[in-house]
């Protein structure tokens, strides 16, 4: 087939000006001013240009990759405390993407391995937020998977390949981009073995899922249906290489501190045994810092799975001071978010310091960490947010400790008038 200008066809045999093939040897011959180029040469030129562009992009991304100190500094803007975890994550992520930038260099005999990460910490301590912030900072595709929904292939539930499908959806099914992404698998502690003893029944949502995740996390070519379709034999699959995807697994691992304490303290029975009170015991965060791979195996993770997660980072339980900082200091702090909502109604929102302390105390009592702060503030501000759009004359709302405790309503300050506050209704 030949393309010529103005439909002209001289009737004589035409040849590609670059490779010399005739019009009968190629699928398409494109005409220019006194020259011709075939489809094969066009493809070759495209490949050359694509390689040069990719090399340039790799070099520029290598220059743009922030140092571990810079990564940790950016994490500080969004996540309060957890300095040790930030340092571990910053170094691991920096080394991971440095490894990706070096992988295509020729003549380098040393092959760098991948270091996936395991985050251990109480609920609401910032595990998911750390992973989300890292992905946003590095501008790479990011997805969160819930380990509790995963089952072995062939059983009711999600296959592990669905994790890669979610990652592809985040980057419009661009396989190259997906292969540089970050996957955060939450609630990883929930797929621990149900028992140390072998059972005649198959553990399809525990050890079975760990086995299924092994190759995916270590690095394999996963077959994923295009555009979220269901698998069937006649379908063409997208092939995604997971060797360069960074997997971050996180979980609360409730009870792991007891496993660690049993290992690290001398046990004894009888009259000579040392009696230790609860007060003498360490805090959960302090115990978790001493975690070793054997402790995770005793908890219920299989040794092969623990081996695929060489980087361990533990997060501390948040105290009252840290929760107060979370309410006010980060870029997207909750008090700033609610102040923005009220600002849209031309109303100033003020939280007194005693109110912030009361919110932090309530969150500690509920044992929900930073995650519980929003639900407390939502409950406190519900009535006010309901009324404010209808009261155009309100200029400021003040929240103090009594409002958080439920003994009074927020103080509303009206334009050109005295402040008004309603007593809380009797329970």
Curated annotation (Swiss-Prot):
Keywords: ATP-binding, Chaperone, Metal-binding, Nucleotide-binding, Zinc
GO function term, MF aspect, one: ATP hydrolysis activity
Any one Gene Ontology cellular component term annotated for this protein: HslUV protease complex
CDD domains referenced in this protein's UniProt entry, alphabetically: RecA-like_ClpX (cd19497)
GO biological process: cell division; proteolysis involved in protein catabolic process
Signal sequence, start to end: none
Positions contributing to Zn(2+) binding: 16, 19, 38, 41
Protein family according to the UniProt entry: Belongs to the ClpX chaperone family.
Function in brief: ATP-dependent specificity component of the Clp protease. It directs the protease to specific substrates. Can perform chaperone functions in the absence of ClpP.
Entries under PANTHER family matching the protein: ATP-DEPENDENT CLP PROTEASE ATP-BINDING SUBUNIT CLPX-LIKE, MITOCHONDRIAL (PTHR48102:SF7), ATP-DEPENDENT CLP PROTEASE ATP-BINDING SUBUNIT CLPX-LIKE, MITOCHONDRIAL-RELATED (PTHR48102)
Self-association state and partner proteins as the record states: Component of the ClpX-ClpP complex. Forms a hexameric ring that, in the presence of ATP, binds to fourteen ClpP subunits assembled into a disk-like structure with a central cavity, resembling the structure of eukaryotic proteasomes.
Protein name: ATP-dependent Clp protease ATP-binding subunit ClpX
Organism in which the protein naturally occurs: Pseudomonas putida (strain GB-1)
Lineage, uppermost ranks: Bacteria, Pseudomonadati, Pseudomonadota, Gammaproteobacteria, Pseudomonadales
Chain's gene name: clpX
